[in-house]
Amino acid sequence: LMADSTNAERPGHTASERTVGNSFVKLFDRAEGKRIIIATFSSNIHRVQQIVNCAVANDRKIAVFGRSMLNVISTAIELGYLKVPDGLIIDLDAMNRFPAEKIVLITTGSQGEPMSALSRMAMNEHRHVTITPNDFIIISANPIPGNEKLVTKVVNELLRAGAEVIYESMYDVHVSGHACQEELKLMLSLIKPKYYIPVHGEYKHLKKQSGLAIDLGMDPNNVIIASIGNVIESDGVDMKITGQVQAG
């Protein structure tokens, strides 16, 4: 078994995505009379669905920014994973036909990526959107380790433009998509793997994850902390690192 280690240091359980939905309901009320811009991960379909639900409840149209966001939303609608009423999503060129307070922008850029839609808005380089004091912006994500400075720069520029900006440390607008300790322990208890390789995280996260498995009774010899490029071999009796290939 290989398992995500990102939240292996966090005790307890990961909060429900419904927490974010409840926050959106309150924030949409708070943003009455303003244009709403929400940046989140394009892969989080449930998060997008909650934004759609709030837009419908508040009689707002939705405009989508960012290639990955457009691709994911269109595919999710096509496959039936995302329920969007006909006519709710409008083309970018049609935004000016609606009052700003009747629009929700869903955009990429929650990690401060320099070429993302939100970053270009913040730097006043987006051809469709100019940030004004009438904008209410929600960054519905936590900075991935290493992206903190990029996100802070975007937030600062949005604030300088006069917008109100909401982010996770201020409000419950994000919950992790990674399992915390109790969920990891439940998974290990249910699956009872013979071999275990913690993945996805810094070394400290992999180390903590391996410790959880050993504390639950796994043989330490069957828990491997691998580095990028390690070759791992198993003969059904034993598992070990046997070599290295060029990677990264």
Give the residues covered by each predicted segment:
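Acidic/His-rich, metal-assisted hydrolase cores and their charged scaffolds
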Residues: 1-248
